[in-house]
Structure formats: C-alpha cells, structure tokens
C-alpha cells in the first residue's frame, strides 16, 4: 500500500522525498575519515599557544646508558604489530634510552576509530640490561620502524625508521641505511644555534589486505614552529615517500629548512684521507645535485671542511634536488662491514610550485664517520605569518639508480679527483708546480653518441682567489665520455676557491654544471 500511495504523489514531491532519504542515509552512514586536516588543526592550535617542552619519564639508568647497552634492548619480532593481519606491513617499536629519552605517542587509525598503541615492556628483550620492571611499566615508545618483505617474500625487512627529533630513514630493495631525511630544520648553521623540531605524535593507518603502501601522519612541535605531515610509503627497488606538509610558525625564525636531508662525508677522491686508509672513500653521499627551475643541472661534490661552510644556490620552483651517492662499485669503498656502495641516494621531487627560494648546503667539520656533517634543504625567500601555513608537497626517492634521476640529454659527473698539480719536464718526469689539479669525468648517453674526435671544450670560471693555469678536455675511451683536467693556483689558502665548469660543443651545452668549492686552509 505504501508503494501505491507514493506512486500517486506528484513528481516534484517524490523527488523531494527521495532527496531527503538520500540525505538521511548520508548523515547516518559512517562517513568519518582521518586526514592531514585533523593533524593540521592540532598543529595550528599548538602554534597559537606557548611551547611546552616535552617531559622525560625515563629512569636515569636508561638515560645514562652507553650505546652498546642500548643496542641490547631489542624488539621481540614475534610481537610485531599487525603480525596477525593479512598484510605485508608490520610495525616494531623503539625503546627509550640514551638521548632518546622522551616518549612519542603512536596511534593506529582504522576506518572507524583512532586507538593509541600502548607501550608494554613485554614488547622488548632487555638482554643483560638489569632494570627495575616497575620503572618501565608506562614509559612510552621512543619511535617505531616499518617492516616489509622488500628483498624476498619470505623475509621481513626494516624499510623505514622514525626515531629522534623529526628524523626518518628509508631503504629500498638491496639497500642499507645511510642518509636521513627530516621533517623540518630551523636556523641550521646560524650563530644562534640550530633548533631541532620533533615529531611528538604519529598516526598510522592500518593497511588493508593487498595494500602496497602505508600511510603515516605526524604532528611536529618545537619552540618556534609546529607542523602536520602525511607520509605515503611505497616500498620497492626504489622506495618512494610522498610527503604532504603544513608548517605553522609560532615565532620568527632566521632560516626555515624545508625537505631537509642529513648525510655524512668524511673523505673521497676529491678530498683524500689525510691519513693512510685502505678505503678510497668513506661517505653516505658524495654530492649535492640540483635540477633548477630553469632546467639547469648542477653537481656540487661534498667536502669535509676544516671550518663550517655554507653554500647557497638561488632556485625558483626547483624541479628537484638531493644528496646522491654516485659510485656504485664495491671497489669505490672496499668496506665489507658498512657497505657504503649499498647506501641510497635521496632525491626530492617537488609537487607544485614552491616559489622563490634557495637550496642550501651546509658542510660541518668531522673527525670520523659517526657524525652526520652534511645538511641540504630548500628555504623560501618569504616566510608566512603565524596564522598562515606554509604548505609544501614533494616525493622522496631512495635509490641506487642515480643515472635514472638525471635528464638523458645532459651528461653528468661520475667522479671528481683531486691531485697535486704538476708539469711534465723535458726528461718526461712530472714536477709539482704549486698548483692544485682536479680531474672531472663526465659521462652519459649524450656523450656516448659523439665521435671521439668531436671538439668538446669546457667553459670554466674560477673565483677571485684562484688563477687557472690549465683547462684541458680529452676523450675518455674507457667511459665513452670526456675528462676535464683543471689546474689552478690558490692566491690565499686561508680562503676558499669557487669553481664552475661545463662541457660544450660550440654553442650547445653538453653537461650539467660542475660547481665546486676548494675549502680554505688546505
């Protein structure tokens, strides 16, 4: 009867009734979904309040422990989070200890709820670390790691680590940890001192069966800034991370470093070890690569300077930048333990227009490989006010296939070698002449397609503190590329020397720009 009565209603009335039914269904259906907007609301609210420093609840025994003791506290793999779900992703957690002395809140997000993942000492094997069980009952986690069978289907591997400040590390198939990324850098290399924002809370979406990606949200906090982040992790030969970020300023900052990367450079062919070492090179990265908005490619080999060094590259709407590990042969490093040949490069691919700004490279002196002494980031020319978020999106690539990042129509630098400058005498013996020599190998498909007799030359510029005494380019039949030999005399060794070079054939540019700084006091 109801159907008959409704069928006799005027058409307009029927449509109105149907619309009301649909609206009622929408209002009563489970339409809730967690998003970066939820985190951004918290970040904006935090930015409007005074900063509250995180409080440590860590017993002194754990705070004062040595690294060897901290390493003994291992997560029990059989207790991995989501181990009973039909998903290849698992979570494991870091215990607090040493300078990781502040808990972070970690939540699981499902289609209907947000639930905190509670700390329990049962997650961990404490090894020989003696402790009072009551003192660790409610500690909280220091961070977490993402587990995924990236190298073989029957073996779980750690592919991402989030531990300390806003640091995170990522690897792809066949890679080992090296370079780190961060959420935000503030006042890096300024006399006032650097401020290290920290991720204070995470939300991790429970993956569905068959999902090949993992979604992580993070809330960032520091004395002068807050932020909301969304990370989408895609494991693979090159693991990629899509990053969506919204940063709010609490107070004025001297320098805001977006998409920061942190790495290590101790020595290499362009700056050999001052002491005899069987390893030809020791570094997580050996150069900064920039793809500028105007299409120019720049390669800046890294240094371990004797004094803090900051290099700036003005770039509007960058197409990409990163700290790369060029050189993938084991013989380039000869290190069986630390496998620097397997450490990934990190490449930032901006999404959308970033506007006017600069890529900055910071090089810090270090005496050993335990200190990360290289930082690179993009900093905007104009900072937003406290009520306006600075929103930047980008994709992070962690790769060992550096040549695939590069434009195929432009040659790139495969290695930079430094040597004592010399001149061959009439008796064929080479004698030093007080100059410094650099040998730069350029390779790439564009060069392989050229005949060895092609008149390739180098456009070179040297700063006021250097005098060029040789600029020679010759074909390299081994690499099917060209080698630039550049010799210069330094006027004042207490000052650095800036150099730039690129290969050309007539009016055509063949290569990226090699941009190098010979450090002072060397």
Curated annotation (Swiss-Prot):
Family: Belongs to the OpgD/OpgG family.
Main location: periplasm
Gene: mdoG
A GO-annotated cellular component: outer membrane-bounded periplasmic space
Metabolic or biological pathway, per its Swiss-Prot or TrEMBL entry: Glycan metabolism; osmoregulated periplasmic glucan (OPG) biosynthesis
GO MF annotation terms: carbohydrate binding; catalytic activity
Signal peptide: 1-33
GO annotation (BP), single: beta-glucan biosynthetic process
Domain of life: Bacteria
Keyword Magnesium on entry: no
Keyword field: Periplasm, Signal
Lineage of producing organism: Bacteria, Pseudomonadati, Pseudomonadota, Gammaproteobacteria, Enterobacterales
Record has RNA-binding as a keyword: no
Task of the protein: Involved in the biosynthesis of osmoregulated periplasmic glucans (OPGs).
Location within or outside the cell: Periplasm
Transmembrane segments: none
Pfam families with a match to the protein in the record: MdoG (PF04349)
Record-given protein name: Glucans biosynthesis protein G
Stored SUPFAM superfamilies: E set domains, Galactose mutarotase-like
